[in-house]
Design a protein with these regions (language model features):
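N-terminal intrinsically disordered, cationic/polar leader segments
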Residues: 1-32, 41, 45-104
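Gly/Ser/Thr-rich active-site loops/lids in small-molecule metabolic enzymes
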Residues: 36-37
């Protein structure tokens, strides 16, 4: 299962952690994993295109995104990413779980 946790400070998402494997299907056929990857990569690329110093992202066993500079655009992109992942989790409850709103 993929676990998405996000951390909020002063009503703004400060950090997002995405860890685990969806285990929906075999490697190369996993539509849940592909969806998650597309959502996250698109968001990271859009943030960096707007302002290369807006976020820091680290990819190892999972992905950790830290917002370094808040702006209306960056916050909208990060919130949209969480919204999209939340919608995906409604259809694939066994494969992705969203936990968040934890204060930093």
């Amino acid at each position: 299962m993929v676990k998405v946790n996000y951390f909020v400070k002063e009503n703004k998402i400060e950090r997002v952690e995405i860890l685990g494997h969806s285990e929906f299907a075999d490697y190369g056929q996993d539509i849940v994993c592909a969806s998650i990857s597309s959502i996250v990569i698109t968001t990271v690329n859009a943030c960096l295109k707007l302002d290369e110093k807006s976020i820091k992202h680290v990819q190892n066993e999972g992905v950790i995104i830290t917002v370094l500079k808040h702006s209306k655009e960056i916050d909208t992109l990060i919130n949209n990413m969480i919204d999209l992942l939340t919608e995906l989790s409604k259809d694939y409850k066994e494969n992705i779980k969203i936990g968040g709103g934890n204060c930093v």
